[in-house]
């Protein structure tokens, strides 16, 4: 039997495929390489370059590779792109996810793990936010994640498909052994930007919003190490294979860090003072979003290994430094 990983050549995907291979799993990666890289797919995993919405290809892979589970990570991570072209985003993500789920049902695939996002909560009324909180997706990216969760729930009710949706916080860090890391061109996430500035690849670090109702006036997020996020997907797969029911769980540490806290930590680790420039708030930016981890810790026995912010940033900085040397 094999595991099909969509988006397995990307940031989280490549880390997950490494973890699956370390567990001895047969892995098929389906990726169009729009934000992924062939070199990021580890030895022993099969890379198929193709589209997650290609029904004929999906049918072929699921039958010939004897796929028993799908880990669905495909999807662009740059949220501003989803805002710039929402209809195109829905076509490339929501509609194609429907094709993936339909192919799984048609070919007898019993388990799907969805990489969802805490972004679907929007502006939560409480932090840490539990899974029972109302959903308020504010961007096409978040709408896509919420709709994918809904499609899986309905497929479960109608066809018996079992699934786990992992609402993950802001993924950061890199493989602790330095095998893979964040390599997406044009990425806009805070950690990537701050580390590039620390390595002299950016002139300054913009801070969008310094007047929020938080201790230092900047936004707060739950940063999750990419290796811990990969482990959560493995735990979700093990849960389903053991006959567990469908679940929706947060994947986070229950502790948030502000923008300025991240910048200060990078300055300490890198030993540099960065040029930090205040900017106006961006539309629909969330003030504070921290995931309540109680359900995932209880139901999936997930045991995060790298929850310390400085550890996350040290691994990420080591990766970025090596990437800069390779590019020189």
Regions found by a protein language model. Give the residues of each.
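Residue-level signature of the cytosolic catalytic core of signaling kinases
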Residues: 50, 183-187, 255, 305
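Short acidic, glycine/proline-rich loop/turn micro-motifs
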Residues: 176-179, 218-219
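N-terminal Rossmann-like NAD(P)+-binding domain of SDR-like oxidoreductases, especially those catalyzing
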Residues: 1-174
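Short-chain dehydrogenase/reductase
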Residues: 90, 138-146, 180-192, 222-223
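Alpha-helical structural signal
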Residues: 13-14, 79, 97, 148, ...
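C-terminal substrate-binding subdomain of Rossmann-fold SDR/epimerase-dehydratase oxidoreductases
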Residues: 191, 199-328
């Amino acid at each position: 039997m094999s595991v099909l990983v969509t988006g397995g050549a990307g940031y989280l995907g490549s880390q997950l495929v490494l973890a699956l291979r370390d567990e001895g799993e047969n892995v098929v990666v389906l990726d169009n390489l729009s934000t992924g890289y062939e070199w990021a797919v580890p030895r022993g995993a099969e890379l198929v370059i193709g589209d997650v919405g290609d029904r004929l290809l999906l049918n072929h892979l699921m039958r010939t590779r004897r796929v028993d589970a799908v880990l669905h990570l495909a999807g662009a991570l740059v949220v501003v792109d989803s805002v710039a072209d929402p209809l195109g985003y829905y076509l490339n993500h929501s509609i194609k996810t429907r094709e993936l789920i339909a192919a799984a049902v048609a070919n007898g695939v019993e388990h799907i793990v969805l990489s969802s996002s805490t972004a679907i909560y929007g502006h939560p009324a409480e932090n840490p936010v539990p899974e029972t909180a109302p959903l308020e997706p504010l961007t096409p990216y978040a709408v896509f994640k919420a709709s994918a969760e809904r499609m899986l729930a309905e497929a479960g009710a109608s066809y018996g498909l079992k699934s786990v949706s992992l609402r993950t916080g802001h993924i950061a860090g890199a493989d602790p052994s330095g095998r893979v890391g964040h390599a997406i061109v044009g990425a806009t996430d805070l950690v990537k930007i701050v580390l590039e500035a620390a390595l002299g690849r950016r002139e300054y670090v913009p801070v969008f919003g310094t007047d929020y109702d938080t201790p230092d006036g900047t936004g707060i997020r739950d940063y999750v190490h990419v290796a811990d996020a990969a482990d959560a997907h493995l735990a979700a797969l093990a849960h389903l294979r053991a006959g567990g029911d469908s679940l929706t769980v947060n994947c986070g540490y229950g502790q948030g860090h502000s923008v300025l806290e991240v910048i200060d930590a990078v300055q300490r680790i890198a030993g540099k003072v960065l040029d930090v420039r205040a900017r106006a708030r961006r539309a629909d930016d969330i003030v504070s979003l921290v995931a309540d981890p109680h359900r995932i810790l209880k139901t999936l026995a997930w045991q995060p290994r790298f929850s310390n912010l400085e550890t996350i940033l040290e691994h990420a900085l080591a990766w970025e430094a090596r990437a800069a040397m390779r590019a020189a």
